[in-house]
Amino acid sequence: MTRKYFGTDGVRGRVGDAPITPDFVMRLGHAAGKVLALGQKTSQGKPTVLIGKDTRISGYMLEAALEAGFTAAGVNVLLTGPLPTPGIAYLTRTLRLAAGVVISASHNPYYDNGIKFFSASGDKLPDDVESQIEAMVEEPMTCVHSDELGRARRIDDAAGRYIEFCKSTFPYEHDLHGLKIVVDCANGAAYHIAPHVFHELGAEVISIGNQPNGRNINAGYGATAPEKLIEAVKANGADLGLAFDGDADRLQVVDADGRLYNGDELLYLIVRDRQASGQRVEGAVGTLMTNMAVELALKRLGVSFVRAKVGDRYVLEELNRHHWQLGGEGSGHLLCLDRHTTGDGIVSALQVLAALRRSGKTLPQLLDGVSLFPQTLINVRVEKGFDWQNHAGLKAVRDRVEPELEGRGRVLIRASGTEPVVRVMVEAEQVETAERAAQELAAALRA
C-alpha cells in the first residue's frame, strides 16, 4: 500500500508546506490519539502520550498543534521540551505511556521539520499502524465532549531521567577519568544532555555545537558536518570526538589523529567488543549500503550478516525477525537492542567508549580487522518511469562486471525515491576497479 504522508522516518517536510502545517499536524495528533491511545485507558480513565522535540524554532508551533489534536481526542499530554529522540522512546516505555511523539527532522536544516511516533514499548511504529493513522487523518476531526478533553502539562525531570538511563548503559566497573572528549551536539536536542553524560562519567568534556538558537541546528556542526569536530579534537589535543545529529539518534566518531569513523566501522567495533566480553553474537544487520568489508570482517568473526533496506526502521525489523541485537547504518544509526529499543547516539558512543576502556586499545587497534572498501557512486538521470531493471545493455555489463569482483566487491543499482535518478554504486578492494566498473555501468544506462 502506497502511503501518502509517512516516509521511512515519520512525516517530514518543509515547514509551512503540506503536510508540515499547524492544521495538518493538529489533525495528525488527533488521528494518532484515536489509533494509538484510546484503546489503552489507564486507571485515571485517560491515556497519556509524551511529546518531545529538537531545537528548531518551528517546534513551538508544531508542539502546540499536536497538543491540541491529542487533547481534542481525549488524550492527556506530557511535554518534555527539547530531548533526543531516543530519550522519548525511553521515557514512553518507562513511564508506561500510550505513545511517544517526536517533533524533529533529524539531520535536515532548520526549515524542515517532522513528526515521528513510538509505541508504548518504545519501538518505532510498524508500517501498518502508520497506515491506520493516515486513514484516520482523512476522517473529519471531531472533538470529544468537554468532560472528556485531555489535559497537558510539562514534565520537569525528563532530561535528568534520560541522562541517568544513558549512564546506566556504561559498565559500572569502568569510568572515563583521564579522557578528554570533544562533544558536538549539532546545536540540537542533545545540547543539554550529552555533555553531562560524559562529564558525570569522569571525562573532561569540551562542548561545541551546544548553543541552539532555533535556526542553527545541523548548520556546520554535528554528524553530517564533522569538520569542526575534527578541528576541535586536534586543537585541544583531545583523545576522542563524538558528533551527534539534530535529534541525537546517530553518531560519528573522530580519533586523536582526526580520523573519522562511520557507522559501519562502529558496528564492527561493538560486535567485536561484545564477543571479547564473552557475549555470543549470532548475527548483525546492516543495509544495502553497508560496506562489504564489514560484512566480510564480521563473517571472519563467525557472525552472520543480513542486509535490510536503507533506514533504521528496516534494520530494526530484520533484527527482530532474526532475534539479534546489533545493527546499524553507515550514517551512524546504531541499534544495540541489549541496551535500548531504538537507535541512540549517546548510548552508541558509550558502547564505543566501553570497548576502549575494556580493551585498553585505541580505535585503530580495535578496527584492525576491517578496512573499508572504496566506493564509487554515480547518479544517472533518467526519464520518469524509466525501466532500468529490464535494460538489456545494463544487464550485459553487470553480468560481465560482477564476476570480475571475485566476491571481494559488489554492485548495487537502485532508483532514487525522491528524484528521477538511478544510483550506481560499486565497491571493490581497489579504487580503480570500483571507478572503472561504475563508469561502465553508468554508460550502459545512458546508452
Curated annotation (Swiss-Prot):
Magnesium keyword on record: yes
Record-listed Mg(2+) binding positions: 106, 245, 247, 249
Modification type Phosphoserine: residues: 106
Comment on bound cofactor: Binds 1 Mg(2+) ion per subunit.
Protein EC: 5.4.2.10
Cofactor: Mg(2+)
GO cellular component terms attached to this protein's record: cytosol
Catalytic center residues: 106
Cited PROSITE patterns: PGM_PMM
GO biological process, one term: UDP-N-acetylglucosamine biosynthetic process
Pfam families for this protein: PGM_PMM_I (PF02878), PGM_PMM_II (PF02879), PGM_PMM_III (PF02880), PGM_PMM_IV (PF00408)
Gene Ontology molecular function, alphabetical: magnesium ion binding; phosphoglucosamine mutase activity; phosphomannomutase activity
PTM field: Activated by phosphorylation.
Reaction equation(s) it catalyzes: alpha-D-glucosamine 1-phosphate = D-glucosamine 6-phosphate
Keywords: Isomerase, Magnesium, Metal-binding, Phosphoprotein
Coiled coil stretches, renumbered: none
CDD domains from the UniProt entry: GlmM (cd05802)
UniProt key word Isomerase: yes
Function: Catalyzes the conversion of glucosamine-6-phosphate to glucosamine-1-phosphate.
Similarity comment text for this entry: Belongs to the phosphohexose mutase family.
Protein name from the UniProt record: Phosphoglucosamine mutase
